[in-house]
Amino acid sequence: MNYVATTCTQPVQVQELIKPYGGNLVNLTVNGEQHRELLEYANRLPSLQLSMRSLCDLELLSVGAFSPLDRFMSRADYQTVLEDMRLKDGTLFPVPITLPVTNRRSVQEGTDIALRSPKNELLAIMTVEEVFEWNAAQEARLVLGTTDVRHPLVAEMASWGGAYISGPLKVLNLPKHYDFSELRKTPAEVHARLQSLGYSNVVAFQTRNPIHRAHEELTKRASEQVNGALLIHPVVGMTKPGDVDHYTRVRAYRILVERYYDGSRTALSLLPLAMRMAGPREALWHAIIRRNYGVNHFIVGRDHAGPGNDSFGRPFYGPYDAQKLLQKCESEVGVKMIPFQEIVYLPDEDRFEEQHRVPVGVRVATLSGTEVRDRYLSNGKRLPEWFTRPETAAILSKITLPMHQRGFCVWFTGLSGAGKSTIAEILSV
């Protein structure tokens, strides 16, 4: 694999909240009179409809979460990222951020195109500077360490087409979200919130799963360990197929933070990230993203961003590969890795403890994800309070209701563009 073939240097000195990666926070959004003029111009341009993955990438490019990137990668940046995990200027950046097109002939270099959402909403104007070919097998092998189609991204890449495009972006509208708008904060907004808490250190916790008692304990200990604030930063874009839906998760996160975390040192914000499930490279990328939100410590667990097992039943990545790579590069990235310690419950003492600190012979209680699903949720049994907060248990219990108790059907008819899809999306929240 190629995910550790790089030299990491350049220690970063932290003063107050850490500065964005590369020094400045990118902002691609256009406002004022120019916005009105470009809206009229964009509606006369040929359009490219983005996939859900590209939509997520464009949103985070626009607000600076991928700083110092200010566009989908050029051929030169793309190739050096594949081979060395660096942009062409030498900046460490482990994951390619690219915009694929299925029909290369539909896009010409030197022209402007309008980028639109999957629902045809106008988002941005790109001046196409490059159209270049790419090799899916090469990218999968170098970035993911595998060409096995059991890896969800390998399977998806087969539908991307044979070309990438790159060029300057003028973002006219960010993607619309009708759910949890108060929690969808930009890097600048999160930075301001964290600054207001008064801590120079911030530890971030990424998750694509519900937060249970052990995770709660871990995050609280981590913020105390660094004497800093805590950013709970769950992914609500594209995660691993089969994950609990983000609507359910965010309802649980919100009530958990409100009732069980110290509001004077905790912030909750949602990250519309399209994960690659790229293991070690992805962990390093996640740390870079968090730095752009004002974070200088990042919790990394076993098999961080791993997609499970390959076609032979073996894990795609080693359990500590992600921790090792981030630890190797943490001084250059400016984000210190905090390893996820296994936390277990001691029923005889009614407390949580790190697994390696538990004396031999002391009784412990744990539940696996399979047990949670098959033993409790699928049978309508409430999860025990030592394992998860009762509010979380109540929310999770609703996702396993019998089908006849789930939701309702609304039938829409009308002309194209009448707003059927928009209304349906709002109702789904």
What are these regions (language model features)?
Residues N2-H404:
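Active-site cores that bind ATP or allylic diphosphates and position pyrophosphate for catalysis
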Residues H404-V429:
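Walker A (P-loop) phosphate-binding motif
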